[in-house]
């Protein structure tokens, strides 16, 4: 199980002036609110934690579509063990902050990377055996030129065509229920795909299972 989420840190709805006075109480646990109050950069941390919650929720939904998003009940705790390796992430992104996240009893490892203007989170089930993780993020100068959904699918196909050594025309992304599915030459690929967009950013992540394991 994987999930990814991107937050445009410069989007108007990400600014403090646009935020409801009770947003933090509704979105974060008591421990997380303490982290925000004591952080040297609470604004950035707020959206790092939010992206961690969203990415883990998306991963949990893959396991059970009945899972609902109640952010204040999604606990995010700093994790100083292990690391999630991103393949294809921009070099200007920082090394990432790792968290452990619990959603409806399901546990996830999450890494959030912050670049110039965005926070990008990637969540994996804590007990998953994952082979390769690919991810990509792109800034779209004019999001009115095409739908964000079309843009993020284009990004994912460009990333995975290179990884799989297939021409982009051989790849397609379809929906099965609410989940994206990658097909290669018309056949479902044994990969788990997650798509995300917010503001001027689109992002994707894809996991291949480890040999003898599940992703």
Give the residues covered by each predicted segment.
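Core catalytic alpha/beta fold that binds nucleotide/phospho-ligands
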Residues: 1-215
